[in-house]
Every structure is written in C-alpha cells, then in structure tokens.
C-alpha cells in the first residue's frame, strides 16, 4: 500500500465531535480463553505485524487490535464487554467466533452505534430481521452450507439420511437440506443431542433404523465426540457415510478413532495456495510448541484464519474510504445515543471489498454475506485428508475423478473390511498352531480360502474375527438379532463369511450375495457298524456257539459212523474175493481214522474214496451231507455280506418316521437357519417336529455342530443340519449316516449390512469363481480325504488281507502241521526199518532221505538185509496167495508172517490150513463175483498165460550151496502168476 495513502488515515477530522485518527484501532472479542486454543490471538498478531511491517508509517498510525475475552456465552457479559469497547474509539469489532448468541448481541449493539461488525463464526439462527446497518460475515452462510450438503447427498445417491443436531436451531440452519428431502419424499430422520451431550443413544437408534448416511451439525469438539462414540459402537465401517458441517474438519484428529475404510466427508475454506499460508501455519506451529508442548498441534483453526482475513479486510475498507473522505474516531458509550458518523460509509466500503485471503476469495453481497468463494470437500484417508471435490457459492458442485463413487470396484479397492465368522468345520477352522499365529493366519477352511480369492480378485484387505456370541443369528422377542446377523445390523462388521444360510427372514434385515453353495437340510444319525474287519473275519458269519456246535456235530457223526460200520455186517467184506486161498478174511473200511476223515471230506464238499455200503452208514452219510449243504450255503451267503458290507441298522428311514416316534430325540443348532426353517414351516410333519423340539426337556438344541455330532454318537439322537456338513462329518466318522433325502433346498451366501454398496461386486466375483471352477476345487480340497468312502460309490471293492488274511494263517498252520507229521512218520518208519534190517538209525535215515529227495526216481525197491544165520525158508505158494492188495498194487505180506497181520485194515481170520507143501494146488476157477476189480483181471490174465516156471528166488531150497543172490525187490505180477 502506498505510504501516502496511509498517511491520510492518521489525519484527524476537524470536526469537533471526532478525535484525530491517531491509529487504526480494532477490537477483537475472543471466546476461547485457553492459551493452546484455536490460535486466534496469534493470528491477530500476525496480521497486525504483517500490515505494520509492510507500511512504513509512524508508530502512532500503526494498526492496533485490542483483545477482549468473553468468559461465557451470555447476553449480559457480551453487553458488558461491548460497553468496555465503545469508549476506546474502534473502527470495527471482530468476533466472537464460536458463540452465535454473543455474536448476535455484538451485531445488535454495533448496529445501534453504527460500528462495523465482522463476523467470523456461524450465522446466528434465527437470523435477525434485516436492519439498515448490518454486519458482514466471513463465515459461510447457513444457506450455502445446507445447499452444499444437499448436493453431496445427491451426487453420491444417498436416498436416506439421519441428521444429528447439537442445537435445536440446526433445522433452521439447514433449511435448504430439509426442504430438499421434503420435495424428493426421501427419509431424513432428525435427532437432537440432550444436555448430557452423550450421542450414544442417538447412534444406537440410527443403527437400529439401518441408516447408513449420517449428517453431523456440530462444532469440531462435539463432532469429534460423536465420531468417537460411533467408533465404539462399530459404526465407522465402510458402510457408514458421515458428512460434517463444521468448517474445522481438517483439524479433527480421527486416525485413532475411525478405520481406514471409513467414509467421512467435511469442508475446508483454507486457500492453501496463498503465499502467506505456509508462514501462517509455521508460525502457529512454533507458537503451539512453545506454549502447548503437552498436546499435539493439529493445524490451524478456521477462526484464526478468518481473524487474519478480517483484519486485512477492515484495513482495505478503511483505505478505500480514506480516499474519499477523512475519517476520525469517536469514543462512544452504552449510556448515550451517539453513533460513529463514519460507520455507515465504512460498512458500504466493506461490502465492496475484494480480497484474496487465507480463506479464499473474500466478497460480500448486499446482505453482508460472503459470496464468490469455494468450499473444498475433503475425505478422511490413510494419508490424512484428500480433496475429492469443490463446492462453489454459485451452487455448483465439481467432483474429482478420484472421488468416492457408488462403483463398487472403486469403493472396495484398498479398503480394509471387518469380516465376522464362526467356527464350523470345514468352512472356518483354527489351525493346529493358531496360538503361535496372529491375524488372518490363525484360520483355515473353505470360507477362508474363498475369502482370500475374493480379496485378490477385488483388491481389498480384510480382518477376520469370530462372532462374539458364537451364533449365526436369530431374532429376539424385542426385535433385535443375535449372532452374525446382529453384528451386521449393528454395523460391527462389513461382511459375514461362513456357512451362512440365506433365508427370507434374514433378507429383511441384511443383504446377501448370490449363493456360493447349494444345499438342503438333512438328518444325521449313527449306525452300528460292528467291529473292524480282522484277519479272522471269515469266522464272522457264524457265532462262536455255532462253530462249537458244528465241531461237536462233527465228532458225533464220526463216532456214530464208526459204531454203525462196526455193527453192520454189510460193512465187513472180502477185499479180494478172487484169492481163494483165504476166503474167510473180511475187512472194514471204517477204521477210526477213516471215520474221522469221511465227515471232513463231506463237509469240505470234496468227497472221499470211502463209500458206505450198509444202509445205516448211508443214512448217517446222507444226513451229514444235508447238514453240510445248509451250513455251507448259509456260510457262503453271510461271508460276502460280512467281508464286503458292514451291517447298518437304522431304526428310521425318513423325516416322517422320525416324527412318528419318540424313542429317538432330534434337534438342530440353536438360533440357526435350520431351527428357523422348522419354526416357520407350515408343513404338518415339520410342525409336529418343531412342537416336539420346542417342548422337549432337556433341550434338544445344541450350540454348535461339534456338540450335535457328539450327541449323535453318544446317545439316541438325530441331528438336523445342512447336507454339506452332513457329508463332511460322514466322511470323518464311518458310524454316521444320512437318513432320507433333503428336507428343503437353500444356499450359503455372504452376508452384508442392508443397503451395502458391495453387494453387486461381491456377487459378480462369486459368479466368476463358480465359472472358473474355483469353488468346486476348494470343495474337493476340504471335503475329500476322509476315512470313509462315498456312500454313492456302489462298485464292488476287492477284499484285502485285513478281511481274509486269517484263512492264509490257517493254511500256513495246516502246512506246518502236515510237514511236522511227515517228519515224525519218517523218523518212526526209519527207526523200525533200522531195527528190522539190523543197521544203524542214522545210516537207514540217510539212505531213505537220499531216495526221498531224488527228483528223478519215482519208484524204489524195498531193501532186505540177508541174515547172517541159517538161511530162511523160501516163500511158500501159500504166502504168495495171501498177499493183500492195496490201491491196485501188490505187496508181499512177508515170509513166515501171518497174512492177517500184514495188512492194515481190520479183518476176520478163520483158521484155514493150507494144502501140503508138496501137493499141487487145484486149478483155480474163474472169478464169479459181480464186479471184477482191476487186480483180479490182471491175475486172471497172468493165469491164462500158462507160464509154469517158478519165479526166480522162489522154490529154491534153503540148503542150496549156490552163492547168495541179492535181495529181491517186491514181487511183480508176473512172478506171482508163475509161482501159482
């Protein structure tokens, strides 16, 4: 400003009623008494020093600002303060900034004395009737603030909202906003803070009304209190939108209160591009650190910047006025009617001021209201505050391209969502080492993997936490909801990701995405599976008692068969009737060993070489064969069932069977969708089931699926639950089975608060995961791998060693016993042969063992040692004739031995002395028995050949002096024939 112009300011009028303007004096009324306050004192000092430093004038013409403190907002104290200001001869009064009632009193007194009043606070309401001499206001008018809020609501398409008022006159201040809701017929609920200044009840009402847009009309301190309480109630999530009318929004410290995903909008008038703005902020910061080290400096308050601009505006107006006339000051008093004669002129010049200050462009209309200014729209972000748009005083709203939008992909990107869930296998489970982990890493499961896929697809972050009461959600008698539904309604969570069933009743209070899994209600019950198959499972078809009785029956049949064969004369017969020499020798094939072996062959269905002859033995055999036929058939039929399919005994087969009986209890999860299904069902069977479950004591409802499974396994209890969880638990426990089919059809979805802007985007993401088969892959990951096979797989399964390994053990044991018996027989036979042949046992054993292990020899000669004493008598013809037949081969009964003792079978030996040794036997008669055995035919053929020479070694006298010949082997058929 030119020095010559300011020199005019210090020239006093010659009028006798005015004093010479020795200095440009102003009065500032401050209603903030704290040193660490809004910085208004410092702002006034900065403005004064800046003006006085630029203008080189004498000290008596310098700008002076007298500060008066207002202790409380009262008309009496304000009037008293004004009475102290008037005698000082001020050209203008500034403030107060935060006391509309006091500001109204100051305006009234200044109007009476015609002293310009510069308002730096909100406009009083109701506005005083327009006077001839009025004040000017640097603060935005109520109409402008109301219009700005209304335009923001329309821009973001917020149909309904709730207004929290700190004072009753807020409806008048926001008259344009209320009028806009009335015209659009949208809902605007208004709630007033009481004298306690506790916003908690109001916030709870808003939460219960499911309103997501909240407008707060209060100063900075009360707005901060409301947001802090909202954070405690979980109402600062991404689903809530806050719009604050205070112009001190930039200095609100919200980082420790709200979340990163919160949507909080406010206004700012600061012109950050002003050349003096950095110096202004730095000076306030330095002053704050010198005087207020205990608290954090949050930034400059709007009232401080308005005080700074007010000083410059008054100086500019006085400068313009001084160009046209000389002005002077006049001391005034409250008790006199005198006025300042230059006040009206200065007021007119004030309305014509155009100034670019710290709060932007400063201009006034004819009513003294600020015009041609802008309001910066800020959004709270992780980096502080982000400008998302500008509102112009000509009622124009310009939003930036990076602003919030209803486009879901933009709102979800880089957001941190609170996700509530509940522990339910296999959807959400704790990891085995969850205590050593933190955050989302503590959990695993199908829903956890699906949420991770969604977060990667939509680029948002999330924080998993368990629902406080451990319930899915059901309505209470008072209208509230429990569980995850209640947390979504109360906006404590942004999403609910779990085995969350979509129901019509829940859809009324919350939103759901499209189902990510389709299922239905099923019945889970336990079955008796019997013991686990073992190596001796082939014994399972019969009980131990049956096996015992079968053994006793076998022994009884063997004994009866032995006795019947011994008693019946038809079982005694001559085995070789063609040998006429001893016709009275009879045999019985049913020895004790054969009697024990014959039932075994029949039982094993392999037969035996022993055939019954008598009617009694045939009767015993037939009865035993009939017995074994039934036993073997029954065993074969039961063996397949026992080794391939375990027995399952289920007393009920459907929901109707379950409802018609009372022996088996049944229930659902408490406060779950299944319980709600039966509660609201109109089907008669389900109504009866609900009446039973509701009236049954003790309660049949359980708190979790694990508790229901344990109750099923430990008692007669049927559990009603979703089919997917039914399938999962059946795979883990083979003693569980599903009864009947599905009772209904429904789906699992992701829950969100009502009106959530994320619904469409999450639904599209779920559909994309289904199309990519990602959800099916996740299901196979968490459902497969159980201990029990699928019940739908009816293909025949091969039997393993655990089923039939016992029969191999029996076979091995039988082979070991057979080898042991063979060894014992070998030792016993070798020992007897050694005694008869008069050789050592070891020599005989080695000789016999050499023949036994020879692979090429299939026959051998019976070795006989020639005795060292007198020569034995030659084998007589009678001995040859008494040779017995066994299995179609001829064996010698031994020289000098008894024929009856030579063969192993029982026989009847009648005393039949043979013919004299010298007599020639008579010619044999042909064999006349009905059935001629093979050996008889061979003997007849030998006789018919007519060979009369005696065989070698037969008929030679014992006294012969010829050298001894080697021991002959067994006599062949031809030798026998020649001997005869």
Swiss-Prot record:
<feature type="transmembrane region" description="Helical">
    <location>
        <begin position="623"/>
        <end position="643"/>
    </location>
</feature>
<feature type="glycosylation site" description="N-linked (GlcNAc...) asparagine">
    <location>
        <position position="735"/>
    </location>
</feature>
<keyword id="KW-1003">Cell membrane</keyword>
<dbReference type="GO" id="GO:0032983">
    <property type="term" value="C:kainate selective glutamate receptor complex"/>
</dbReference>
<dbReference type="InterPro" id="IPR019594">
    <property type="entry name" value="Glu/Gly-bd"/>
</dbReference>
<dbReference type="Pfam" id="PF00060">
    <property type="entry name" value="Lig_chan"/>
</dbReference>
<feature type="disulfide bond">
    <location>
        <begin position="165"/>
        <end position="170"/>
    </location>
</feature>
<comment type="similarity">
    <text>Belongs to the glutamate-gated ion channel (TC 1.A.10.1) family. GRIK5 subfamily.</text>
</comment>
<dbReference type="GO" id="GO:0042995">
    <property type="term" value="C:cell projection"/>
</dbReference>
<keyword id="KW-0406">Ion transport</keyword>
<dbReference type="GO" id="GO:0099507">
    <property type="term" value="F:ligand-gated monoatomic ion channel activity involved in regulation of presynaptic membrane potential"/>
</dbReference>
<keyword id="KW-0732">Signal</keyword>
<feature type="glycosylation site" description="N-linked (GlcNAc...) asparagine">
    <location>
        <position position="400"/>
    </location>
</feature>
<feature type="glycosylation site" description="N-linked (GlcNAc...) asparagine">
    <location>
        <position position="219"/>
    </location>
</feature>
<protein>
    <recommendedName>
        <fullName>Glutamate receptor ionotropic, kainate 5</fullName>
    </recommendedName>
</protein>
<feature type="topological domain" description="Cytoplasmic">
    <location>
        <begin position="825"/>
        <end position="980"/>
    </location>
</feature>
<comment type="subunit">
    <text>Homotetramer. Heterotetramer with GRIK2. Can form functional heteromeric receptors with GRIK1 and GRIK2. Can form functional heteromeric receptors with GRIK3.</text>
</comment>
<feature type="topological domain" description="Extracellular">
    <location>
        <begin position="15"/>
        <end position="544"/>
    </location>
</feature>
<keyword id="KW-0675">Receptor</keyword>
<dbReference type="GO" id="GO:0035249">
    <property type="term" value="P:synaptic transmission, glutamatergic"/>
</dbReference>
<feature type="glycosylation site" description="N-linked (GlcNAc...) asparagine">
    <location>
        <position position="285"/>
    </location>
</feature>
<dbReference type="GO" id="GO:0031630">
    <property type="term" value="P:regulation of synaptic vesicle fusion to presynaptic active zone membrane"/>
</dbReference>
<dbReference type="InterPro" id="IPR001508">
    <property type="entry name" value="Iono_Glu_rcpt_met"/>
</dbReference>
<feature type="glycosylation site" description="N-linked (GlcNAc...) asparagine">
    <location>
        <position position="478"/>
    </location>
</feature>
<dbReference type="GO" id="GO:0005886">
    <property type="term" value="C:plasma membrane"/>
</dbReference>
<feature type="disulfide bond">
    <location>
        <begin position="83"/>
        <end position="334"/>
    </location>
</feature>
<feature type="transmembrane region" description="Helical">
    <location>
        <begin position="545"/>
        <end position="565"/>
    </location>
</feature>
<dbReference type="GO" id="GO:0005783">
    <property type="term" value="C:endoplasmic reticulum"/>
</dbReference>
<dbReference type="GO" id="GO:0015277">
    <property type="term" value="F:kainate selective glutamate receptor activity"/>
</dbReference>
<dbReference type="GO" id="GO:0098839">
    <property type="term" value="C:postsynaptic density membrane"/>
</dbReference>
<keyword id="KW-0325">Glycoprotein</keyword>
<dbReference type="GO" id="GO:0050804">
    <property type="term" value="P:modulation of chemical synaptic transmission"/>
</dbReference>
<feature type="transmembrane region" description="Helical">
    <location>
        <begin position="804"/>
        <end position="824"/>
    </location>
</feature>
<keyword id="KW-1015">Disulfide bond</keyword>
<keyword id="KW-0966">Cell projection</keyword>
<feature type="glycosylation site" description="N-linked (GlcNAc...) asparagine">
    <location>
        <position position="271"/>
    </location>
</feature>
<keyword id="KW-0407">Ion channel</keyword>
<feature type="disulfide bond">
    <location>
        <begin position="36"/>
        <end position="292"/>
    </location>
</feature>
<dbReference type="GO" id="GO:1904315">
    <property type="term" value="F:transmitter-gated monoatomic ion channel activity involved in regulation of postsynaptic membrane potential"/>
</dbReference>
<feature type="compositionally biased region" description="Gly residues">
    <location>
        <begin position="894"/>
        <end position="903"/>
    </location>
</feature>
<dbReference type="Pfam" id="PF10613">
    <property type="entry name" value="Lig_chan-Glu_bd"/>
</dbReference>
<feature type="topological domain" description="Cytoplasmic">
    <location>
        <begin position="566"/>
        <end position="622"/>
    </location>
</feature>
């Amino acid at each position: 400003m030119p020095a010559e112009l300011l020199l005019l300011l210090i020239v006093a009028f010659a009028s006798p009623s005015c004093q010479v303007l020795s200095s440009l004096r102003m009065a500032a009324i401050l209603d903030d008494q704290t040193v660490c306050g809004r910085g208004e004192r410092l702002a006034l000092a900065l403005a004064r020093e800046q003006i006085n430093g630029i203008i080189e004038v004498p000290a008596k013409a310098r700008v002076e600002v007298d500060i008066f403190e207002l202790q409380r907002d009262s008309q009496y104290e304000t009037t008293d303060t004004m009475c102290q200001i008037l005698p000082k001869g001020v050209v203008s009064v500034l403030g107060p900034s935060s006391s509309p009632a006091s500001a109204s009193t100051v305006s009234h007194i200044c109007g009476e004395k015609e002293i310009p009043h510069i308002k730096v606070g909100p406009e009083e309401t109701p506005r005083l009737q327009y006077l001839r001499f009025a004040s000017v206001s640097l603060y935005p008018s109520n109409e402008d603030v109301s219009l700005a809020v209304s335009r923001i609501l329309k821009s973001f398409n917020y149909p309904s909202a709730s207004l929290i008022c700190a004072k009753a006159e807020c409806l008048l201040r926001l008259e344009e906003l209320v009028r806009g809701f009335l015209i659009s017929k949208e809902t605007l609920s208004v709630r007033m803070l009481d004298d306690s200044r506790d916003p908690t009840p109001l916030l709870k009402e808003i939460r219960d009304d499911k309103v997501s847009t909240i407008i707060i009309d209060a100063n900075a301190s009360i707005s901060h209190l409301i947001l802090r309480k909202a954070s405690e109630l979980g109402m600062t999530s991404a689903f809530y939108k806050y719009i604050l009318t205070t112009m001190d929004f930039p200095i609100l410290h919200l980082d420790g209160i709200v979340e990163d995903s919160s949507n909080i909008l406010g206004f700012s008038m600061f012109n950050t591009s002003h050349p003096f703005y950095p110096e202004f902020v730095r000076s306030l910061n330095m002053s704050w650190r010198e005087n207020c080290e205990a608290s954090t400096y949050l930034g400059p308050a709007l009232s401080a910047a308005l005080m700074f601009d007010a000083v410059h505006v008054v100086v500019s107006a006085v400068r313009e006025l001084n160009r046209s006339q000389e002005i002077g000051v006049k001391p005034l008093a409250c008790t006199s009617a005198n006025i300042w004669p230059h006040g009206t002129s200065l007021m007119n010049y004030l309305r014509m001021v155009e100034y670019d200050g710290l709060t932007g462009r400063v201009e006034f209309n004819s009513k003294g209201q600020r015009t041609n200014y802008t309001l910066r729209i800020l959004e709270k972000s992780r980096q502080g505050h982000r400008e998302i748009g500008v509102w112009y005083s000509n009622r124009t709203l310009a939003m930036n391209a990076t602003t919030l939008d209803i486009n879901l992909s933009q709102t979800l990107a880089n957001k941190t969502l609170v996700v509530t869930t509940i522990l339910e296998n296999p959807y959400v489970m704790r990891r085995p080492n969850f205590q050593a982990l933190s955050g989302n890493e503590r959990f695993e499961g199908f829903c956890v993997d699906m949420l991770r896929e969604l977060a990667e697809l939509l680029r948002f972050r999330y924080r998993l936490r368990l629902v406080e009461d451990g319930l899915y959600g059901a309505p209470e008698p008072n209208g509230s909801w429990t569980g995850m539904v209640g947390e979504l309604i109360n906006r404590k969570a942004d999403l609910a990701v779990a085995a969350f069933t979509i129901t019509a009743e829940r859809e009324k209070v919350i939103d759901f995405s499209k189902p990510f899994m389709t299922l239905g209600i099923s019945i889970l019950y336990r079955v008796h599976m019997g013991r686990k198959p073992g190596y001796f499972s082939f014994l399972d078809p019969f009980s131990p008692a049956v096996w015992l009785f079968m053994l006793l029956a076998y022994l009884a049949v063997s004994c009866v068969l032995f006795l019947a064969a011994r008693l019946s004369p038809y079982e005694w017969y001559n085995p070789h009737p063609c040998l006429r020499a001893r016709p009275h020798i009879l045999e019985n094939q049913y020895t004790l060993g054969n009697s024990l072996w014959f039932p075994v062959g029949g039982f094993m269905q392999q037969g035996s070489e022993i055939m019954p002859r008598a009617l009694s033995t045939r009767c015993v055999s037939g009865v035993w064969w009939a017995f074994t036929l039934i036993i073997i058939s029954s065993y074969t039929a039961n063996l397949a069932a026992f080794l391939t399919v375990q027995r399952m005994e289920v007393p009920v087969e459907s929901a109707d069977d379950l409802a018609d009986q009372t022996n088996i209890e049944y229930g659902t999860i408490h406060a779950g969708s299944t319980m709600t299904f039966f509660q609201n069902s109109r089907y008669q069977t389900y109504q009866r089931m609900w009446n039973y479950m509701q009236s049954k004591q003790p309660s049949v409802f359980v708190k979790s699926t694990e508790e229901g499974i344990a109750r099923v396994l430990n008692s007669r209890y049927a559990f009603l639950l979703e089919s997917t969880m039914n399938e999962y638990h059946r795979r883990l426990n083979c003693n569980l089975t599903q009864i009947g089919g599905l009772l209904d059809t429904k789906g699992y979805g992701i829950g969100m608060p009502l009106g959530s802007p994320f619904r469409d985007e999450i639904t599209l993401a779920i559909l994309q995961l289904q199309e990519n088969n990602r959800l099916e892959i996740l299901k196979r990951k968490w459902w497969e791998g159980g201990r029990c096979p699928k019940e739908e797989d009816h293909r025949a399964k091969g039997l393993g060693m655990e089923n039939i390994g016992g029969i191999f053990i029996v076979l091995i044991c039988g082979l070991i016993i057979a080898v042991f018996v063979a060894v014992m027989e070998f030792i016993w036979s070798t020992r007897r042969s050694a005694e008869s042949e008069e050789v050592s046992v070891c020599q005989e054993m080695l000789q016999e063992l050499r023949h036994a292990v020879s692979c090429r020899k299939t026959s051998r000669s019976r070795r006989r040692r020639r005795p060292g004493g007198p020569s034995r008598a030659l084998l007589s013809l009678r001995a040859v004739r008494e040779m017995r037949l066994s299995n179609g081969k001829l064996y010698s009964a031994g020289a000098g031995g008894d024929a009856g003792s030579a063969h192993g079978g029982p026989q009847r030996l009648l005393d039949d002395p043979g013919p004299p040794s010298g007599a020639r036997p008579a010619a044999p008669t042909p064999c006349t028995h009905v059935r001629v055995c093979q050996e008889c035919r061979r003997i007849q053929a030998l006789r018919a050949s007519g060979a009369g020479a005696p065989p070698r070694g037969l008929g030679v006298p014992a006294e012969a002096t010829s050298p001894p010949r080697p021991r002959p082997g067994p006599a062949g058929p031809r030798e026998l024939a020649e001997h005869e």
